[in-house]
């Protein structure tokens, strides 16, 4: 995976850190996100995701390092390329007493867009037609999410920053939003930066995923390569883990542990064929049915990556 060209970068942070007293909320994070890319920013609650976003948006000043958005240096109190940026917080804000239609007209006016065309387009795009006269306070959580996304998209931004964008949506709604974001990236050339703790959804939407843990960006992966790698690993749940690990290591297999302490085996010649591993262990004296073998799942991979135990 090649490095993005400097002129093609929409988000760039250079060794950015943020301190709250003695707590290092963000620790030397360097991000490079391309034009037209969907980038997933993944971490547990408190990992540093929201603090990073607030620095991207110029809401807070880094303790050290530099932030660039759309090629422009970002610092609080200075102007920024905000006419090119759309942002949706985890709990979208709206004027509660205004209807959906009035909220979108107001958002359009704040962006200095002429007429009602942008508001009508967003109502159709986010399937809010039935709710145009409903006050924002009376919407379901899912429709509040739709309204928040509509407000973020209303001015055709070059960069869309989303914090937990599918919270409160049903499965059908999640699929709709996923396809909408892909369309924004592929057809409109928008860059989409998704912050979330939900690896499953992020891996379905993003091209690349950055893992932040305890303030540090500890890994970046290609989502398709991650999915393929899971199918190249087998998880063995055996009673005698130490005995099985020792035997398989003697047989030349690289044996690791997943987040739950189960054996993790990367064996391209047998992956996808768990029955062969069962047969090998049975021949070695492990009783039949003694071993359960499956591909590693996303949750196990994530917890193993950040070094946390499964609970």
Explain the meaning of each model-derived region:
Residues 1-17, 308-311:
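ABC-family P-loop ATPase nucleotide-binding domain
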Residues 2-3, 121, 222-226:
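Short, flexible cytosolic linker that couples an ABC transmembrane/permease module to its adjacent nucleotide-binding
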Residues 8-11, 18-194, 199-213, 217-219:
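ABC transporter nucleotide-binding domains
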Residues 35, 100, 223, 295-298:
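Structural motif detector for alpha-helix initiation sites
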Residues 104-105, 120-123, 175, 227, ...:
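Generic structural signal for individual residues within well-ordered alpha-helical segments
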Residues 178-268:
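ABC transporter nucleotide-binding domain
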Residues 232-305, 311:
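Short, charged/small-residue-rich alpha-helical element at the C-terminal edge
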